[in-house]
Every structure is written in structure tokens, then in C-alpha cells.
Amino acid sequence: MNKFIVFEGIDGSGKTTQAKMLAEKLNAEYTCEPTTGKIGRTIREVLSGSECKKETLALLFAADRVEHVSEIEKMLQKSHVVTDRYVYSSIIYQTMQGISKEFIYSINFFAKIPDIVVILDVDTEEALKRMEFREKEIFEKIEFQKKIKQEYHKIAELKCSKFEPTYGFVMVNTTGKTPEEVFNELFNKILDKIPDII
């Protein structure tokens, strides 16, 4: 049976690189949030600095995810699916903006439960160095990223009962490691939990 794998972590932790490496290793479909669809493009405009109420942004993410989940279901019929960000990003980022978890849970009630979630950890300073040449988004300020990092630790340690992955969470620290070193570590951790994934 094909697996649904999610990558999470602060900006600059290496999610996109590692998600693509895993997709290639497993011959899986790679996807991401926000998506490249109409709603996803609107979200990217807001993240780049356009004005938007926090509740509207949360609803946009949920609406984009409705479309995304539909695509994920189709892709899972043919192969494993690896996504760069998912509902856990909404739980963390939107609650950090002052929106209640209950609101986030309610507007994401449809979200498909992943088989496993890989959380990539990294020193905040190293993450910011990695992002020096990227366009900055509204969520990329250092203090904010430190708080986000703490929230990811809470999700991994205390569990996220509403969207608990079938095989749980895996956390890998990427600080000072090459992409290959990170990949070997996370892939072995995934194999420990899901031996039949390959």
C-alpha cells in the first residue's frame, strides 16, 4: 500500500531538498503547500507582503489544502506521495498569529492523516544563513522562527492528537550536516517505522 509522507520544519531547515531526495529514492510523487494552483498562488502573494487578515489567510490555506488532498488521493493510487508542508504548518503558523487551534482544526477537518511526518530541526542562525539569497516572507523573522521551532518540538514530543500520523513523527537535526548525511539519517528512521516502504 502506498504511503503519504509529510515534511515539516522551519524555513531553511532543508525540507524541500530532503522531500525531493526522498521522492526520488522511493520513486514517489513530490508535492508541496502552498500548491501551485490559483489559491496557492494567492497565498504566496500574501506571504510576500500583501495585506490580508489572519483569519482570511488561515481559510486560504485550508481551501488550498482541500484541492491538495484531492490530488494526493489520486496520486496515492499510483505511488507513494511526499509533501513539503501540510496541516501541521497551519496549526503552528496560524496559532502563532493568534488564531485558536480549535478554529484551525475545524476548517481542516477533511485533512488526510499522513502515514509519517518528518520534522527537520536546525539552529535558527544556520537556517537564516541558508535563506540569505531567498526572497523574504512574512514568517521569516528570527524571533518568530525560534518560536516556530519550539512549537515543532512540542508537536513531535507531545504528539498532535487531532492529526496523529499512523506511524508517528520522526525528528532529524540538520545543523552542520550535508544533505546526504541528513537523508541517510531520516531514511533509516523512516525504515525503522515502515520497513516495507521500499
From Swiss-Prot:
Domain of life: Archaea
Residues that coordinate or bind ATP: 9-16
GO molecular function terms attached to this record: ATP binding; dTMP kinase activity
Family annotation (InterPro entries): P-loop_NTPase, Thymidylate_kin-like_dom, Thymidylate_kinase
Annotated GO biological process: dTDP biosynthetic process; dTTP biosynthetic process; dUDP biosynthetic process
GO cellular component, one term: cytoplasm
Pfam families per the UniProt record, alphabetical: Thymidylate_kin
Transferase among keywords: yes
EC code: 2.7.4.9
Keywords: ATP-binding, Kinase, Nucleotide biosynthesis, Nucleotide-binding, Transferase
Reaction catalysis annotation: dTMP + ATP = dTDP + ADP
Family: Belongs to the thymidylate kinase family.
Name the record gives this protein: Probable thymidylate kinase
Organism this protein belongs to: Methanococcus vannielii (strain ATCC 35089 / DSM 1224 / JCM 13029 / OCM 148 / SB)
